């Protein structure tokens, strides 16, 4: 969990690379409040989403699109590949993450069930060092976070430059 202007902030990366160039007004953006810490930031993010997005029959907000990137270890969002598989059924929309392997160690992540409920999920798997994680994710019985997302959804669009 870092402030939105920190170099490790996903919001900072997307804001500078996408939102600012496209002139998307800041009042149209809902960002994770990592600077408030994992529990408080996760609660606030869930409350904000529930105010603007309808829920499915299981109580999960139905987002139009979730765009994920693949980490070198096969993680997506901040869902670690070494988490117990039981986390796939956790109904938390957002939750705190502690001791994540890649800095920063404290994070806020969207939950598997919320990803599963989205109308569309797009995955970007690109770049050096991600080839093995990508192949492991596509293999039957894959153990990566991305493999878990694929098992939860009937369709996920994958954008990649990795030869399969």
What residue spans do the PLM features occupy?
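Ligand-binding beta-strand-loop-alpha-helix segment within the catalytic cores
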Residues: 1-65
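Short, conserved loop/helix-junction motifs that constitute active-site signature segments
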Residues: 22-23, 86-88, 113-118, 150-154
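A short secondary-structure junction signal
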Residues: 42-43, 76-82, 133-137
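A generic local secondary-structure boundary/capping motif
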Residues: 51-58, 110-113, 146-148
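ATP/nucleoside-binding phosphotransfer catalytic cores, i.e., glycine-rich phosphate-binding loops
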Residues: 117-164
